[in-house]
Regions:
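Electrostatically charged, flexible surface regions
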Residues: 138-255
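Alpha-helix C-terminal capping segments
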Residues: 78-84, 111-122
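Glycine-rich phosphate/pyrophosphate-binding loops
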Residues: 117-139
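Short acidic, Gly/Ser-rich segments with clustered Asp/Glu that frequently serve as metal-coordination loops
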Residues: 9-17, 204, 212
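Short glycine-rich anion-binding loops that position phosphate/pyrophosphate groups of nucleotides
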Residues: 9, 37, 70-71, 95-98, ...
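Short beta-strand segments
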Residues: 6, 32-34, 92-95, 126-127, ...
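Glycine/threonine-rich flexible loop motifs
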Residues: 98-107
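A cross-family phosphate/adenosyl-ligand binding-site feature
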Residues: 3, 14-81, 85-86
Length: 255
């Protein structure tokens, strides 16, 4: 089996090293990841400037390609230029922080996996809920258990799974829940300051509201201590609404 790994925390992040170590015995593992942190870049790609690419050896654990670009860039480069053949499986992560609810749209980790699915490759994004101490080694073991189950079930082309691992400082997960994204927005605000040149500067800050119940969703699964598995796809069409919108009295001509 050939596996491609990417992430959005950067090629030197502990999460990608833990993921590599967790799956290294499954076959040939290639790593193509951003040269620095790309959190919350979503599915952005680099079209206005070239990307520098260099080979690196990370902590005597793995060799990989370090890319001055986004996670989706890394996947495109791997699929089109860097690898001599398409991988059988793409993994993205392990991200420092959960990617649940609306975060899926912002997440570079998830975007890397969706980009893999666009290329027809079965893809999985792994994210670890934040806590005081992030145990990526344990998260890697959990990721491997989830992955082994997926492989036994049969890898489907062009599919994407988002796997969120609950905080591990309170013990091992209670199990796995397959569930949709929560329809939950962040409570957001900006911290305002003044820069050295006197211009106003703003820092975005926020958190998911703890008091809002989201039964049978990824957010609630993590709250209950379960691994949340959510199938995703690049098609954002609201098919139920599409049928309704089609019935509107649209103009038949714009001439």
């Amino acid at each position: 089996m050939r596996i491609l790994i990417t992430n959005d925390d950067g090629i030197l992040a502990p999460g990608i090293e833990a993921l590599y170590q967790a799956v290294g015995d499954l076959g040939q593992v290639d790593v193509v990841a951003p040269d620095d942190a790309q959190s919350a870049v979503g599915h952005a790609i680099s079209v206005l400037k070239p990307m520098a690419v260099r080979r690196v050896h990370v902590n005597n654990v793995f060799h990989g390609w370090s890319v001055a670009g986004r996670p989706a860039d890394c996947v495109k480069l791997a699929m089109i230029e860097l690898l001599d053949q398409r991988p059988d499986l793409l993994l993205s992560g392990i991200n420092a922080g959960a990617n649940t609810g609306v975060n899926v749209l912002y997440s570079g980790t998830v975007a890397g996996a969706i980009e893999g699915a666009i290329f027809g490759v079965p893809s999985v994004a792994f994210s670890l809920q934040l806590s005081d101490e992030l145990d990526f080694h344990k998260a890697g073991r959990i990721a491997r258990l989830v992955l082994d189950h997926y492989i036994r079930a049969g890898l489907e082309p062009a599919t994407c799974l988002s796997v969120n691992i609950p905080r591990l400082d309170k013990g091992w997960p209670r199990g796995v829940r397959c569930c949709p994204q929560a329809p939950l927005n962040w409570d957001e605000h900006f911290k305002k300051d003044v820069g050295e040149d006197g211009d106003a500067i703003y820092w975005l800050d926020g958190r998911l509201p703890d008091h809002v119940s989201c039964p049978d969703t990824d957010v609630e699964a993590l709250r209950d201590g379960y691994v949340a598995v959510t199938p995703l796809r690049a098609d954002l069409t609201d098919h139920r609404r599409l049928e309704q919108v089609t019935q509107w009295a649209w103009p038949q001509s714009f001439a």
